[in-house]
């Protein structure tokens, strides 16, 4: 916890300083510290994305970023704003912050932390954004803007990757500044995302903040749209938010489309990033093939698409079975999956129906626009990969829309307190959660409370690997574990080596260094046998 407090003491003023520069140049969506912090996150994340094309996000980049942010913080005397905020809200804000920090100190338990988040951040901080890196490891082709942001602060300020704790505190500051007490209800749920740099947390938090502004008819549409696009570039499943912002501007505010130009420019940067790392504008889809080099092997992309469909059904059906589904079966089997995920899917459908009936009752244009946007997102996700985690934001937005005008401060605070205690018990004694919900697989990866958490966040260390070479690529393979989260670069997880072997290909360096990027080539029978020997006895 001490390490997380240090991270917050460093990064909160730094990001506020950057946000003050942004608001001085471009204005603000709303007043208060929370916007300065949000704008700081936006500005630094965009800057890091641009820099990562050319250089690693190392200690020198981090040092320069910290220096500029702190200079701005003191130049604009922003410590006065922080002091005033604490004077007004310290009684509730400080205990709530400590609870947030405590949640953030637990062991990471989301599997993507080890197979995707940490390796991505490692590449960005040590090498930068690498062209065609999806040829080495398809997952790395995503390179979320949130991980670019985290990577830039992973050298000194936040080596344990708890940036999501900071994002949650930005949200808490917003709640206090806006007196939007209903948002307290969402915090216990979000606490489960702050042990890892999961992009799910920032997109949910920012979408709730922006939706709150839309519902109060904020007219800063240019900024609302570009921040909505920012949410999309962090996680493209949030496509409903920029669509809603666009519809809100055109239908409600009746503005001209030129106001979306800054957002379109940010979107183009997102497409450039994806083309650079993946070869196509939108990961992991083979859409809009512009003929760029460095695209992954077609068989690997086909396997990825099939896996996404199987994950839609929680791996309870083989792809060949799913292909034989009728349109009715496709929906029915998704709704009635065995285990907790089927119940979540059914609750999602009930949520959409409830939202529809609420829109009919209220007869509000803005609510109808929001419903249309969420329905559009839902249909897209159903078509490509309807995993329950892609719908989590929708549940919270529906609750916000239905209750934001009617709930007093008392009910959210009581709900927050009860659910937070329950959440701490689950994280501290995960065996009870596994017994209560056997089908909740993530419960198996929770490790409980450790007294060392009071000093530094709990984290895993393995550092077991072997080095091999195929062609011009010397690579490291983790031992006794399926994910290469702390294996020196370049590292390839056993599962991806197996996919390469099955496809008869293997990645190669495009030039003389890792920064030059990767391509793939066919392998010889001798190389294939060597890879099979490497894979023998490795977990996959």
Residue ranges and their predicted role:
Residues 48-52, 188-192, 221-247, 262-268, ...:
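Membrane-interface alpha helices of multi-pass inner-membrane proteins
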